[in-house]
């Protein structure tokens, strides 16, 4: 038994064929796997990269499912070459569960003669290769101590007859690796129908791919969205609560042995909660990187109290996240105006408007170029305040000699093309408003630029986490925060103080020097005095009235 199941090999599950090809490639060592098949895919179904001769080569795969005695002709090869051109990849592949016609083979020879690298993978090739593959994935990760501890606690809770478990692990510290290992161990205990729920299609696909390295090839996986229900077969199903919601009346509450909820802070939404109240699994697992909700509701009502919490600061202290050089660039504070506004009873919104001068893009680019001098092979992610600014700033960066792609409000295929080009090194920077918050994983990012003042701690931590993942050759991540919100300053000072005083459990490493620096020391003093009276300033609403500390 393996993930290349009969419905896939017989051509009745074309989406399953796409993902099986992607899983096979990931299992054998391809990287940056992205399943892209669907409307507007420009002829590509799977994107990936692979090191070849010391160079990163990008691949695009056109997947063709056939039933009965049908064959794949040369048109599929032409579509694959069109995809190669659109996504600007080095290699194109046409893969099928069936066989190719003689004219398709002849067309391949013509294209090879013309300089294209085009490979044909037929059904026999796929089946034989998957059967001969090792049971374990090439990217199987050995668990770190804190990950192993969480897995052991969750599995022990299951063995003790408990019905639920909940853990909080910050972005970049492997919460999906933990969940996949839990699923693997519960599978071995007879839990053969596992449901993984989330709130977004891209996240469901990323979760499925995130599970692959930790599970053996015998465990089938599938996804459901676009209004389709989960499959009632053995395996791990990944999908959206929105799709599940419409099918609840026809789903046996005990259909699934285990239900795992990712980004659990979404679970209190009405539809999500209704799904979880309907389902009666043997065990419910909740996980999140960012437990805060804007409406103040608590996740403990569904998942219970967390059995473990590992914060960003914990991860940095243990050395499992990149070393951070966080620079709060507050040269835009209007100190000249401070005296005139210090006697007024201002809201946070009004204070931000009066305290911070507009930041010029040219000054931001100068500061960014200075930071790039300190990093070998700079890879930059920029968070803009608006789509209009994102597009304009990407153009300005490119014109200044830093190739940059805007990611917000572009067609999905084009965004994937740009992300692949970024992963392959064709762009040095990407610029977005919010599409990098969830479901995007770019470990090589070593410079983050914040031009946007988010009022959500959860979103801010997700954005910060984009640059914290470790990767080969990455010495540190420089964060340039062109702050324009007093709450952001408070957030970072609190995190910095935590880093100085709190080591992670069972660890003796501390961030005694902190990791945050201010371009103007007066700002840190200003916010620290304020924090004495406003302990929760970082979570305060726009309309909260503030009183200036004396002396400012």
Feature locations, PLM:
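Mixed-charge (Asp/Glu-Lys/Arg
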Residues: 1-169, 177, 515-518, 526-546
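Conserved helix-turn-beta segment of the N-terminal RecA-like "Helicase ATP-binding" lobe
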Residues: 202-225
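Conserved helicase ATPase core of P-loop NTP-dependent helicases/translocases
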Residues: 222-231, 391-395, 402-436
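A short beta-strand element within the Helicase C-terminal
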Residues: 256-257, 429-454, 459-464, 477-481
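Post-DEXD/H (motif II) to motif III coupling segment of the RecA-like Helicase ATP-binding lobe
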Residues: 265-327
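Conserved interdomain linker/interface between the two RecA-like ATPase lobes of SF2 helicase motors
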Residues: 306-381
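Long, largely alpha-helical accessory region at the distal end of helicase-like NTP-driven motors
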Residues: 363-374, 379, 491-552
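Conserved segment of the helicase C-terminal RecA-like domain
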Residues: 457-462, 466-497
């Amino acid at each position: 038994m393996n993930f290349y199941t009969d419905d896939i090999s017989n051509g009745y599950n074309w989406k399953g064929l796409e993902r099986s090809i992607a899983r096979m490639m990931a299992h054998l060592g391809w990287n940056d796997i992205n399943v892209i098949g669907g409307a507007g895919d420009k002829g590509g179904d799977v994107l990936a990269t692979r090191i070849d001769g010391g160079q990163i080569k990008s691949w695009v795969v056109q997947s063709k499912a056939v039933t009965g005695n049908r064959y794949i002709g040369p048109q599929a090869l032409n579509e694959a070459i069109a995809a190669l051109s659109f996504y600007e990849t080095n290699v194109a592949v046409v893969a099928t569960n069936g066989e190719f016609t003689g004219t398709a083979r002849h067309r391949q020879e013509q294209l090879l003669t013309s300089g294209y690298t085009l490979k044909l993978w037929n059904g026999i090739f796929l089946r034989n290769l998957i059967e001969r593959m090792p049971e374990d994935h090439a990217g199987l990760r050995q668990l770190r101590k804190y990950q192993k501890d969480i897995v052991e606690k969750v599995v022990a809770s299951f063995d003790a007859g408990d019905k639920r478990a909940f853990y909080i692990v910050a972005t970049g510290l492997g919460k999906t690796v933990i969940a996949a290992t839990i699923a693997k161990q519960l599978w071995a205990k007879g839990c053969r129908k596992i449901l993984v729920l989330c709130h977004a299609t891209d996240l469901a696909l990323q979760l499925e791919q995130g599970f692959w390295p930790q599970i053996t090839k015998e465990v089938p996986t599938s996804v459901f969205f676009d209004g389709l229900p989960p499959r009632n077969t053995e395996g791990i199903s990944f999908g959206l609560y929105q799709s599940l919601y419409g099918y609840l009346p026809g789903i046996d509450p005990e259909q699934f042995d285990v239900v795992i909820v990712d980004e659990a802070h979404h679970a209190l939404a009405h539809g999500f909660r209704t799904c979880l109240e309907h389902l009666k699994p043997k065990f419910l697992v909740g996980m999140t990187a960012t437990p805060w909700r804007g409406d103040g509701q608590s996740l403990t009502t569904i998942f219970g109290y967390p059995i473990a919490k590992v914060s960003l600061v914990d991860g940095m202290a243990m050395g499992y996240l990149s070393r951070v050089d966080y620079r709060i660039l507050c040269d835009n504070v209007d100190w000249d105006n401070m005296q005139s506004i210090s006697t007024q009873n201002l809201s946070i919104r009004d204070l931000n408007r009066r305290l911070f001068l507009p930041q010029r893009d040219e000054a931001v680019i100068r500061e960014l170029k200075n930071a790039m001098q300190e990093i070998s092979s700079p890879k930059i992610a920029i968070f803009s305040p608006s789509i209009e600014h994102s597009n304009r700033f990407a153009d300005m960066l490119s014109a200044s000699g830093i190739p940059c792609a805007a990611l917000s409000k572009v067609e999905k295929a084009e965004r994937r093309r740009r992300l692949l080009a970024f992963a392959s090194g064709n762009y040095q920077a990407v610029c977005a408003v919010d599409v990098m918050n969830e479901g995007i994983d770019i470990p090589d990012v070593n410079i983050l630029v914040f031009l946007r003042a988010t009022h959500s701690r959860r979103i801010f931590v997700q954005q910060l986490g984009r640059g914290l993942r470790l990767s080969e050759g990455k010495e540190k991540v420089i964060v340039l925060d062109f702050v324009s919100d007093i709450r952001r300053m408070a957030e970072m000072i609190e995190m910095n103080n935590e880093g100085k005083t709190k080591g992670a459990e069972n660890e003796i490493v501390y961030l005694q020097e902190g990791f945050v620096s201010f371009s103007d020391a007066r700002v840190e003093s200003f916010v620290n005095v304020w924090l004495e009276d406003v302990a929760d300033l970082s979570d305060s609403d726009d309309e909260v009235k503030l009183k200036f500390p004396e002396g400012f």
